[in-house]
């Protein structure tokens, strides 16, 4: 009897650890969907091999929101590599060209901005006018979609400009991607010969320098880990992030997370994405 009591005591002593441990990634995603009363799409992909490690609704469509800006700047860099564009080229614009949330471009009406500066503003600060000015250089939404088709992405599509593309209507395929397609496209841009090595480094550096992603995966990143990311936010609860992660300050995996159709606040959406990121990282470290 004494032996049995000791066994029970030993078992109970382990329960707090089980209760407080982070759930497995898919368990966390299911929990997030329940708490958000919405949909979550996610994929975790090995950067080197392209192998899918974790996936949930990875082939369902979600609004891209501002995550499209990474692909946009990839298209711009492809034009630079082809000799059709220069990062140093100055673009001038007018007050009527500005749209909501243009924290960088609104300060340069007098002097304009270079193509490279516009890419930096679009990715690091999610500047919407910068994105529209860059979209014009690649042929608008149709031109960017054509670029995606050229590199083998037959799913992702951009149909509108900022800020209309963030409408996120249920059942609307416009301006959407799937987690799997976005991850595969990002991998092509950063590892294949679609871009020169120099352009790959530049695109990655812009993502490293992201200044508006603090409340998401960056908030749960262990010391010494690498992250390069781009976030997006839209109407009807849409939120998203595309990221490269890895220990020892090395990019090893692509993580794409999208939310949609949730009444949750921005803070709640950020917290859920951070929670999914934390579960992925903990599972990775085991």
Curated annotation (Swiss-Prot):
State the Gene Ontology BP annotations. beta-lactam antibiotic catabolic process; response to antibiotic
**What is the residue range of the signal peptide feature?**
1-21
- Active site (record annotation): 66 (nucleophile), 164 (proton acceptor)
Keywords of this entry: Antibiotic resistance, Disulfide bond, Hydrolase, Plasmid, Signal
A GO MF term: beta-lactamase activity
Work out whether the entry's keyword set contains Signal: yes
Summarizing the annotation, the consequence of altering residue 66 to C is: Forms sulfenamide bond with Lys-69
Positions with a binding annotation for a beta-lactam: 69, 126, 162
Domain of life, per lineage: Bacteria
Q: Which cysteines are joined by disulfide bonds?
A: 73-119
Induction notes from the record? Increased expression in clinical isolate strain 15571, in concert with reduced expression of a 45-kDa outer membrane protein, confers increased resistance to ceftazidime.
Effect on the protein of changing residue 270 to V/Q/E/C/T/H: Reduces resistance to penicillins about 8-fold and to cephalothin about 8-fold in DH10B E.coli strain. Decreases resistance to combined ampicillin and clavulanic acid about 2-fold in DH10B E.coli strain
Q: What is the effect of changing residue 270 to M/P/W?
A: Reduces resistance to penicillins about 1000-fold and cephalothin about 500-fold in DH10B E.coli strain. Abolishes resistance to combined ampicillin and clavulanic acid in DH10B E.coli strain
Q: Which PROSITE patterns match?
A: BETA_LACTAMASE_A
Q: Tell me what effect the entry lists for residue 101 to G/K/N/V.
A: Reduces resistance to ampicillin about 30-fold in DH10B E.coli strain
Record's catalysed reaction(s): a beta-lactam + H2O = a substituted beta-amino acid
Matching Gene3D superfamilies, A to Z? DD-peptidase/beta-lactamase superfamily
Its Enzyme Commission number(s) read 3.5.2.6
How is the activity of this protein regulated?
Inhibited by the beta-lactamase-blocking agents clavulanic acid, sulbactam, avibactam or tazobactam, or SA1-204 or LN1-255 via a covalent binding to Ser-66. Inhibitors SA1-204 and LN1-255 may be approximately 16-fold more effective than tazobactam. May also be inhibited by tazobactam via a covalent binding to Ser-126.
Recorded consequence of changing residue 230 to A: Reduces resistance to penicillins about 500-fold in DH10B E.coli strain; reduces resistance to cephalothin about 30-fold in DH10B E.coli strain
Please explain the role this protein plays, according to its UniProt record. Answer: Broad-spectrum beta-lactamase which confers resistance to penicillins, as well as first- and third-generation cephalosporins. Has nitrocefin-hydrolyzing activity. Inactive against the cephalosporins, cefotaxime and cefoxitin, and the carbapenem, meropenem.
According to the record's subunit comment, the protein's assembly and interactions are:
Interacts with S.clavuligerus beta-lactamase inhibitor protein BLIP.
Family classification? Belongs to the class-A beta-lactamase family.
Miscellaneous notes for this chain?
A: The class A beta-lactamase family has a specific amino-acid numbering system, sometimes called Ambler or ABL numbering and often misspelt as Amber. A multiple sequence alignment was used to derive a consensus sequence and then the consensus was numbered taking into account insertions and deletions. This allows use of identical numbers, e.g. for active site residues, despite differences in protein length. UniProt always uses natural numbering of residues, hence there appear to be differences in numbering between this entry and some papers.
Q: What is this protein called?
A: Beta-lactamase SHV-1
């Amino acid at each position: 009897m004494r032996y049995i009591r000791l066994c029970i005591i030993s078992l109970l002593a382990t329960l707090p650890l089980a209760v407080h441990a982070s759930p497995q990634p898919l368990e966390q995603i299911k929990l997030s969907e329940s708490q958000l009363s919405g949909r979550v799409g996610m994929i975790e992909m090995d950067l080197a091999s392209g192998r899918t490690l974790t996936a949930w609704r990875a082939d369902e469509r979600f609004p891209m929101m501002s995550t499209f800006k990474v692909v946009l700047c990839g298209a711009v860099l492809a034009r630079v590599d082809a000799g059709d564009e220069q990062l140093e080229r100055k673009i001038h614009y007018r007050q009527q060209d500005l749209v909501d949330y243009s924290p960088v471009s609104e300060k340069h009406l007098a002097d304009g901005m270079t193509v490279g500066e516009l890419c930096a503003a679009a990715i690091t600060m999610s500047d919407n006018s910068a994105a529209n000015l860059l979209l014009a250089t690649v042929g608008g939404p149709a031109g960017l979609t054509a670029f995606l088709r050229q590199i083998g992405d037959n799913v992702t599509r951009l149909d509108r400009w900022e800020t209309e593309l963030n409408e996120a209507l249920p059942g609307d395929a416009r301006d959407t991607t799937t987690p799997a397609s976005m991850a595969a496209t990002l991998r092509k841009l950063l590892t294949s010969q679609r871009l020169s090595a120099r352009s790959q480094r530049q695109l990655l550096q812009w993502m490293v320098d992201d200044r508006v992603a603090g409340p998401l995966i960056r908030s749960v990143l262990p010391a010494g880990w690498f992250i390069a990311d781009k976030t997006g936010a839209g109407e009807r609860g849409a939120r998203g992030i595309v990221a490269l992660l890895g220990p020892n300050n090395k990019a090893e995996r692509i993580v794409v997370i999208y939310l949609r159709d949730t009444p949750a606040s921005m803070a709640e959406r950020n917290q859920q994405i951070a929670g999914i990121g934390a579960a992925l990282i903990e599972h990775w470290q085991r």
